[in-house]
């Protein structure tokens, strides 16, 4: 990794071409270009319209349940201090995005995109989903606003996330199992892009993470930034100062970007992103694009990708369906190269330990995705002084993972 000179601000991207340094952009078929430009224009207009912001805030409060609490994880903090050297052991806070309606951070972004789709007069919404959380959030808001909803989901994920598949169908969505490729998130996204090209007139593609062609990475980040904005306000109210560090898990990276972005220019705040190391980065069975990948183009943007020797996209593996994406949002790739954010990775085994510990100590069953972040909190917190304030984004609840984790632990439900 080469450290480039630090810019005056880490928050000015992307440029007018949708780039963060050499990352991002819009590498799409000619047929999609008019749609992308329309979307960019509509988003710029919505951002400048006070009524759009008012709608976001109103539905955020009364439908999603914002603000989400910033919660002091007291027993976890004490547990880690007990085995840390004297005077060590950070004070740990959870940003509780799992308490949102639909059970994760995904709904923040979907609300913004669905309100935008309505402004653009698009009655049909398509989405891709891995763990099913983005699919559920999209189906939920389509039901709320009476829009047709089609969700593409890899056939493997359909099997391991059965509760969410049923939820989507209950909400009136059509769930399309994708049988091509690895039959996971990457393939679901490919199918959704194909659908969009075919149905340009009436369809809005609601992307679930900070990936895809510009303006999606910036737009999704903006809609998720409510997480970091609230965290700043809440921490100032609780502790009278900013946190010392932030930790979040990363698949495509929208929950992390939402927490990180408002803090990027607060240079004293350490920022950690946690990718999925699967069976270990050396094993080849992982989803850690920054740790084990290299720059390339996928799904309309240039970013770090998992590739084989021939430059073909490699299979990603993670215990968590929401993290097994072979790429990462382009802004994360840029922040990695600039050295502003430190990217770590957590194995399946470490994640399961954190999943158990959080459940037992805090009475919160986390999703497997934020359990990756928690596993690194367990490592980082004991190395920090006791006055260090650490915030982890608890981006989703674990209900969807209970059948899978029960099976791993040898329990039959």
From Swiss-Prot:
EC number: 4.2.1.20
InterPro entries recorded: Trp_synth_b_CS, Trp_synth_beta, Trp_synth_beta/beta-like, TrpB-like_PALP, TrpB-like_PALP_sf
Origin: domain of life: Bacteria
Alphabetized Pfam families for the sequence: PALP
Pathway annotation: Amino-acid biosynthesis; L-tryptophan biosynthesis; L-tryptophan from chorismate: step 5/5
SUPFAM superfamilies: Tryptophan synthase beta subunit-like PLP-dependent enzymes
MF terms in GO: tryptophan synthase activity
Reaction catalysis annotation: (1S,2R)-1-C-(indol-3-yl)glycerol 3-phosphate + L-serine = D-glyceraldehyde 3-phosphate + L-tryptophan + H2O
Cofactor section: pyridoxal 5'-phosphate
GO cellular component term, pick one: cytoplasm
Class in the EC hierarchy, top level: lyase
This protein's UniProt keywords: Amino-acid biosynthesis, Aromatic amino acid biosynthesis, Lyase, Pyridoxal phosphate, Tryptophan biosynthesis
N6-(pyridoxal phosphate)lysine: residues carrying this PTM: 106
Function: The beta subunit is responsible for the synthesis of L-tryptophan from indole and L-serine.
NCBIfam families: trpB (TIGR00263)
Family from the record: Belongs to the TrpB family.
SUBUNIT field: Tetramer of two alpha and two beta chains.
Protein name: Tryptophan synthase beta chain
